[in-house]
């Protein structure tokens, strides 16, 4: 068991990938419809989804997603979901190795290139997947969460200080994307914002925290509250991106460039570094828990206890070899 505040921080980082930042920025190109989807989507869809996923796991002894599905939909569906979820988790983990490594390489000297950071991030993933939650994740996640929240609060404060001109919700309720004919609001905007409003990936992460909880009373602040917090972060970045597009046009398609420009102009050098650390922390903390989820799902499937390091390695070695193969490919 972990303290509730720490469980909240870990859950928040587990579910907050690049969606509430990069996704919200790209979603802002579609106009103020992105604001409405982030608000209503996170409240009535994303948070409800995460809460149900977490509470179902909590009431069934911390079972992982495929086991819960099998309990209610039968053995065949469970077997399909086991395979699908493990493959999905390995793919997510592999994607969230290359992305953060590229961001770190852009902040460090040329000698520390992307390949170097890929190795560093991957070694961290191996350790975070193998060791118990309280050994690494429980210690560093709160620091990552503080960096991510500092970034969001800092941008929010500067929105009020700079008081940029933003379109009224109803005036901007049209597709403002430069390529609107090829990129309709539905479904492209929803896919772009992704976990800034709702994500099925979260259903694989909530059971991890359900195993660390001691009371159902903690379910609402942890599962529901973490998604609402993610929605707030997404809304802040959507507003900041709207200002950026208003001042600089919509030609820029690299969300990382937009993040860098906004944070350096509004938060200064030190604030910009902390903000970028928050951006890097978001995918890293989703990647390591993706691998961890895959390990626990396979362990449930094989009925293999995970107290000994040797048994963890039986599962992790093939899984990480598959991820390395994807990265090399």
Predicted segments with their positions:
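Flexible loop linkers connecting adjacent transmembrane helices
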Residues: 1-2, 26, 32, 48-77, ...
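Membrane-helix boundary/coupling elements in multi-pass transport proteins
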Residues: 18-25, 43, 61, 88-101, ...
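Membrane-water interface regions at transmembrane-helix termini and the short interhelical loops
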Residues: 29, 56, 67, 96-108, ...
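Hydrophobic alpha-helical segments and their helix-loop junctions in multi-pass secondary transporters
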Residues: 93-119, 125-129, 148-176
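Helix-loop-helix junctions that connect adjacent transmembrane segments
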Residues: 142-145, 151-203
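Extracellular/periplasmic helix-exit of transmembrane alpha-helices
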Residues: 160-170, 224-261
């Amino acid at each position: 068991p972990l303290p509730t505040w720490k469980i909240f921080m870990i859950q928040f980082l587990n579910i907050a990938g690049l969606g509430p930042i990069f996704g919200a920025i790209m979603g802002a190109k579609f106009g103020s419809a992105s604001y409405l989807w982030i608000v209503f989507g996170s409240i009535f869809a994303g948070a409800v989804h995460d809460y149900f996923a977490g509470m179902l796991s909590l009431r069934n002894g911390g079972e992982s997603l495929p086991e819960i599905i099998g309990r209610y939909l039968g053995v065949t569906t469970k077997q399909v979901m086991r395979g699908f979820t493990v493959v999905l988790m390995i793919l997510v983990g592999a994607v969230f190795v290359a992305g953060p490594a590229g961001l770190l390489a852009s902040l460090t000297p040329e000698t520390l290139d992307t390949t170097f950071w890929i190795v560093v991030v991957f070694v961290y993933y191996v350790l975070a997947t193998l060791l118990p939650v309280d050994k690494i994740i429980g210690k560093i996640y709160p620091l990552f969460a503080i960096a991510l929240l500092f970034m969001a609060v800092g941008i929010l404060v500067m929105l009020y200080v700079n008081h940029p001109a933003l379109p009224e919700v109803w005036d901007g309720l049209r597709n403002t994307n430069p390529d609107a004919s090829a990129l309709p609001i539905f479904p492209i905007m929803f896919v772009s914002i992704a976990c800034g409003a709702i994500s099925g990936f979260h259903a694989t992460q909530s059971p991890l925290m359900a195993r660390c909880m001691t009371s159902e009373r903690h379910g609402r602040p942890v599962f529901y509250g973490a998604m609402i917090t993610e929605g707030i972060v997404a809304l802040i970045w959507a507003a900041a991106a709207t200002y950026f597009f208003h001042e600089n046009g919509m030609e820029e398609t690299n969300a990382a460039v937009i993040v860098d420009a906004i944070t350096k102009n509004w938060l200064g050098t030190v604030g910009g570094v902390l903000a970028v650390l928050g951006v890097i922390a978001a995918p890293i903390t989703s990647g390591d828990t993706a691998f961890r989820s895959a390990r626990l799902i396979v362990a449930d499937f094989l009925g293999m206890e995970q107290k000994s390091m040797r048994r963890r390695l039986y599962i992790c070695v093939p899984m990480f070899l598959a991820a390395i193969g994807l990265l090399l490919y």
